[in-house]
């Protein structure tokens, strides 16, 4: 005990020396409120703002100072009148001004510990007559302290009070440092630590996608630790800090102007996050007004919903988003405060200064050239609005009272007065066993819900709940409007928010990318990017990645996904289809007409001489070639694809097999006549039909094997240069389709060779010549078709149309060169369709190397066509 006393005396000496020096330095005249009681609570409030230059204290702080001070007095009055809370115990107060400075607050707080340092043990000091020593000017013994306001003040005071085990409850200090119980083990607060607020602010930025912002913090624990917590939360959400500024304690206008100039150096950081004390916030907004700078402010509860901060600079603050601790107004305090005036409030030595400042008048005769205050002036709803932390001041006083009440009930169970065990308070026991365990419903709160419960967590912190305000101009009047709240999660009414430029501002290092662009982040920087356009066939998997939709798919309009492209193919109503189909129909009609004419005149000499069996086969092939146009225009399907593969080669094989059989027959007959050979074999109609069918069968077998090895089907085909179009095609390559015509090409070549060999037939015996014309023209068509087919491979419409027209032209060549002359004679020159001379093949005789005829005129008769029974004179038919 003696060792402790010596330590306390030593501490007193050290503090007293510094304290007396400070008094001398500042010509100090103490203002304080001292109201005696059984238990006394200390109070620290920023009644004056910090001064400028050499002055410690500045103007009266109307809201954070006077209102909060009166809130403590109001709470003390209510508790002393309460019959259930500390009945029989009167609470007193000792309230001091901090002048919004931590160093000044520390000097003031020495008054709270003087009682502990100067307390004399009565048992050790007695008078000779046995009586105890009389102690004069004994300082009030402080049971606990309510305050301070700023975190820097509370930290300094907490370091002092912990030495003397005096519990402390703050109503506004939110620095995260104060949650460290190893250093601030007698500190509690009715407000949450700043890291909750920092998290809420970061979530607001992320909500509006503000990823590149500037920050300004007040020097000291509130601003520095708050902005540090915000930066940690910002990093977790990929939010970058463009520039981080700090406002010192000098409170010089130039420093605020300098900060604004620095903020303007980052034009893309349109949002500025403020973790500042109220006076610093006011000066910064004023500096922005002087510079005519426009920012979107996101401010902590240091700004909150205070009118004094934006007074005179409302246009600069318009659109600001501010946070304020969630609280309910104490209506009973409104009535109490509005009843005060300088004539009935004598216990508050600062109230007269407050009154003069608020109403811009003087309570003395024309002091400072001001008008004399009217005695009818009053505080009312037109000039008063309850400060946002009044509830927390009241809750702090009641929390201390509830802790003392429980301690008194425990230590003094048989009395409502203070027993000896309570006269010397054990601060450690009061804090840990009672204060941290209190749990009660906030007084004067009409809502009896979970949000109205007052309690502390294991770190002595209050619960984290915030209101979000937006500074607006409605009907020409500026005001704060609550637009959301935060309690672990953010809830915002975006439609209620007003912005300075009537739209949600952007605050990003780089300009937003267009809807079809992705962000390419710059190395080492998570907030700056360049915009790279996605390819037309890519969608945005996220804002940093363009992904290929894949073949046959295309990105949606909003580029959030892909959809299957519709299959494109030639439709019957397309111009690409109408032309080929018209040509094919015309050709098919011509073919039918020729067949009709031939059938009707089937037994006439001309039809017989033409080799009618091969003619019908040839006409069937021509008709089939016209049908191919319909197969190529039709929508691809497995059946259509099979018919295409089977029909294309087969139609040509039928035509050219018939022509090859015919030209081969002519060539063999003339070779026989010229060489005097015996009658050629296999020149009868049936033989020629079988030869022709055999040639056709080869093609059918080849195509059948092809269909078996490669089953017909469809495929979705996309050209690399035309990804937006999906073509529905048969599942064969164009090259495979042409390879399948190899056999037909061989037939064409052989036909052409035979036609060339028989080109010197007698002039009046010229069917071979017409076959030659047919083959030459066919070769020209196909030589022209092949390059066009391959060159137009990128446009399936042109390619298909070219194929259809080429096939139809091949049919027209056969009809025009071979059948048109015959039809013309049959219909318009029937006199030529007769028999005048006949030469039987059995009259051939072979002698030597030549062939002779029994008639002397035989040399003037040359067979015109292959016919196993007879050869007609050319005078019968020129064909």
From Swiss-Prot:
One of its GO terms (cellular component) is postsynaptic membrane. Residues 1-22 form the signal peptide. It is a multi-pass membrane protein. Residues 600-613, 665-688, 757-769, 829-879 are cytoplasmic. Glycans are attached at residues 209, 292, 414, 439. The keyword Signal applies. Disulfide bonds join 57-99, 240-527, 361-373, 412-419, 509-528, 513-531, 534-546, 549-562. Coiled coil: none annotated. GO terms for biological process: cellular response to stress; chemical synaptic transmission; G protein-coupled glutamate receptor signaling pathway; gene expression; negative regulation of adenylate cyclase activity; postsynaptic modulation of chemical synaptic transmission; regulation of synaptic transmission, glutamatergic. This is Metabotropic glutamate receptor 3. L-glutamate binds at residues 151, 172-174, 222, 301, 389. The chain crosses the membrane at residues 577-599, 614-634, 646-664, 689-709, 735-756, 770-792, 803-828. It comes from Homo sapiens. The keyword Coiled coil does not apply. One of its GO terms (molecular function) is group II metabotropic glutamate receptor activity. G-protein coupled receptor for glutamate. Ligand binding causes a conformation change that triggers signaling via guanine nucleotide-binding proteins (G proteins) and modulates the activity of down-stream effectors. Signaling inhibits adenylate cyclase activity. Keywords: Cell membrane, Disulfide bond, G-protein coupled receptor, Glycoprotein, Membrane, Receptor, Signal, Transducer, Transmembrane, Transmembrane helix. CDD domains: 7tmC_mGluR3 (cd15448), PBP1_mGluR_groupII (cd06375). Belongs to the G-protein coupled receptor 3 family. Interacts with TAMALIN. Pfam families: 7tm_3, ANF_receptor, NCD3G.
């Amino acid at each position: 005990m003696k060792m402790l006393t010596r330590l306390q005396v030593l501490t007193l000496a050290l503090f007293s020396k510094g304290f007396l020096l400070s008094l001398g330095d500042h010509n100090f005249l103490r203002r304080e409120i001292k109201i005696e009681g059984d238990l006394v609570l200390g109070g620290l409030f920023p009644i004056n703002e910090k001064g400028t230059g050499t002055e410690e204290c500045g103007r009266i702080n109307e809201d954070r100072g006077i209102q909060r001070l009166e809130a403590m007095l109001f709470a003390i009055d209510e508790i002393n009148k309460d019959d259930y809370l500390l009945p029989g115990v009167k609470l007193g107060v000792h309230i001091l001004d901090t002048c919004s400075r931590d160093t000044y607050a520390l000097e003031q707080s020495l008054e709270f510990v003087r009682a502990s340092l100067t307390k004399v043990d009565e048992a050790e000091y007695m008078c000779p007559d046995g009586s105890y020593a009389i102690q004069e000017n004994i300082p009030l013994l402080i049971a606990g302290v309510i305050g301070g306001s700023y975190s820097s003040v509370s930290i300094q005071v907490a370091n002092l009070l912990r030495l003397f085990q005096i519990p402390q409850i703050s109503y506004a200090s939110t620095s995260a440092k104060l949650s460290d119980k190893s250093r601030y083990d007698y500190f509690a607060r009715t407000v949450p630590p700043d890291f909750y607020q920092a998290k809420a602010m970061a979530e607001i930025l992320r909500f509006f996608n503000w990823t590149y912002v500037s920050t300004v913090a007040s020097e000291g624990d509130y601003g520095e630790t708050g902005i540090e917590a915000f930066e940690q939360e910002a990093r977790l959400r990929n939010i970058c800090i463009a520039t981080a500024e700090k406002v010192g304690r000098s409170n010089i206008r130039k420093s605020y102007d300098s900060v604004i100039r620095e903020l303007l150096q980052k034009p893309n950081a349109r949002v500025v996050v403020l973790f500042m004390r109220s006076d610093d916030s006011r000066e910064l907004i004023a500096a922005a007004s002087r510079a005519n700078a426009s920012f979107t402010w996101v401010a902590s509860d240091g700004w909150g919903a205070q009118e004094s901060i934006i007074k005179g600079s409302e246009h600069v603050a318009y659109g600001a988003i501010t946070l304020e601790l969630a609280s309910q107004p104490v209506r009973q305090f409104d009535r109490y405060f509005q009843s005060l005036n300088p004539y009935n409030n004598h216990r508050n030595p600062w109230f007269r200064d407050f009154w003069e400042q608020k109403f811009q008048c003087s309570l003395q005769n024309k002091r400072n050239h001001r008008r004399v205050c009217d005695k009818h002036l009053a505080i009312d709803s037109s000039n008063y609005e309850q400060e946002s932390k009044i509830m927390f001041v009241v809750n702090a006083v009641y929390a201390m009272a509830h802790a003392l009440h429980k301690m008194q009930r425990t230590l003094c169970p048989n009395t409502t007065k203070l027993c000896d065990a309570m006269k010397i308070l054990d601060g450690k026991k009061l804090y840990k066993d009672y204060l941290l365990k209190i749990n009660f419903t906030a007084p004067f709160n009409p809502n009896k819900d979970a949000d109205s419960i007052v309690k502390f967590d294991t770190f002595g912190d209050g619960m984290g709940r915030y209101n979000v305000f937006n500074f607006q101009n409605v009907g020409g009047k500026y005001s704060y409007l609550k637009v959301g709240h935060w309690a672990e999660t953010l809830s915002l009414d975006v439609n209620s928010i007003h912005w300075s430029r009537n739209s949600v501002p952007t605050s990003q290092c780089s300009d937003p990318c267009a809807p079809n662009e992705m962000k390419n982040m710059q190395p080492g920087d998570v907030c700056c990017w360049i915009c790279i356009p996605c390819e037309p066939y890519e969608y945005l998997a996220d804002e940093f990645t363009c992904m290929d939709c894949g073949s046959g798919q295309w990105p949606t309009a909003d580029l959030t996904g892909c959809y299957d492209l519709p299959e494109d193919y030639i439709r019957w109503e397309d111009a690409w289809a109408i032309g080929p189909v018209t040509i094919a129909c015309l050709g098919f009609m011509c073919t039918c007409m020729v067949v009709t004419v031939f059938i009707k005149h089937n037994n006439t000499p001309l039809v017989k001489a033409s080799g009618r069996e091969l003619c019908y086969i040839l006409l069937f092939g021509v008709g089939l070639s016209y049908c191919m146009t319909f197969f190529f225009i039709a929508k691809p399907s497995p059946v259509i694809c099979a018919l295409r593969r089977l029909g294309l080669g087969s139609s040509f094989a039928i035509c050219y097999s018939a022509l090859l059989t015919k030209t081969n027959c002519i060539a063999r007959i003339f070779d026989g006549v010229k060489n005097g050979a015996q009658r050629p074999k296999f020149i009868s109609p049936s033989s020629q039909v079988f030869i022709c069918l055999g040639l056709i069968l080869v093609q059918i077998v080849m195509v059948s094997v092809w269909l078996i090895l490669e089953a017909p089907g469809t495929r979705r085909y996309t050209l690399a240069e035309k990804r937006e179009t999906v073509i529905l095609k048969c599942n064969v390559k164009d090259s495979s389709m042409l390879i399948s015509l190899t056999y037909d090409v061989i037939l064409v070549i052989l036909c052409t060779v035979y036609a060339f060999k028989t080109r010197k037939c007698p002039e009046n015996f010229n069917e071979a010549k017409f076959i030659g014309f047919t083959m030459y023209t066919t070769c020209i068509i196909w030589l022209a078709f092949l390059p066009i087919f391959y060159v137009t491979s990128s446009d399936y419409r042109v390619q298909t149309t070219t194929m259809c027209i080429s096939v139809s032209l091949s049919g027209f060549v056969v009809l025009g060169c071979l059948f048109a002359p015959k039809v013309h004679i049959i219909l318009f020159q029937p006199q030529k369709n007769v028999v005048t001379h006949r030469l039987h093949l059995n009259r051939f005789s072979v002698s030597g190397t030549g062939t002779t005829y029994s008639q002397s005129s035989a040399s003037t008769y040359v067979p015109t066509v292959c016919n196993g029974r007879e050869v007609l004179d050319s005078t019968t038919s020129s064909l």
